Amino acid sequence: MAESFNFELVSPERLLVSEKVTEVVIPATEGEMTVMANHAPTMTTIKPGVVAVKTAAGKTERYAVFGGFADILPSGCTLLAESAVHVDELDPTVLENRIEAARAELEGAGDEKKTRLEQFIAELTKLGEIVIPA
């Protein structure tokens, strides 16, 4: 059995998860990252995507996150999300509204901001394809 560690998923609205887990897969900006017990200390940024949490009991839960930071230590991992929700609670209209708001910001945006917004829109679109049934 895999060793467990402490994991917390926190958004400004609430604490979504605080428990012992055996594995967490996070959507880091450098690519998906699997965190397990005794992981090397790391701090990374999170892009919009799905966080998969495997509990010590063996159950896997999935959460949609919309950016943030992860602080990883050998004894645990804390993910501070800009916004997060369990995938079962994700409202497709909320996701579509975020995409539309980002598209509206594109008008008049400078080159650097435009590039970041286009990337954000692509990440939100991919998130929608992953968690919202067709």
Swiss-Prot record:
Gene Ontology terms: cellular component: plasma membrane; proton-transporting ATP synthase complex
Compartment list: Cell inner membrane
One family name in Pfam for this protein: ATP-synt_DE_N
Protein purpose: Produces ATP from ADP in the presence of a proton gradient across the membrane.
SUPFAM superfamilies assigned: Epsilon subunit of F1F0-ATP synthase N-terminal domain
Quaternary structure note: F-type ATPases have 2 components, CF(1) - the catalytic core - and CF(0) - the membrane proton channel. CF(1) has five subunits: alpha(3), beta(3), gamma(1), delta(1), epsilon(1). CF(0) has three main subunits: a, b and c.
Gene for this chain: atpC
Alphabetical keyword list: ATP synthesis, Cell inner membrane, Cell membrane, CF(1), Hydrogen ion transport, Ion transport, Membrane, Transport
Membrane topology: Peripheral membrane protein
The keyword Protein transport is assigned to this record: no
GO molecular function: ATP binding; proton-transporting ATP synthase activity, rotational mechanism
Predominant localisation class: membrane
Organism of this sequence: Rhizobium meliloti (strain 1021)
InterPro entries attached to this UniProt entry: ATP_synth_F1_dsu/esu, ATP_synth_F1_dsu/esu_N, ATPsynth_dsu/esu_N
Family according to the record: Belongs to the ATPase epsilon chain family.
Protein name, per record: ATP synthase epsilon chain
Entry annotated with the keyword tRNA processing: no
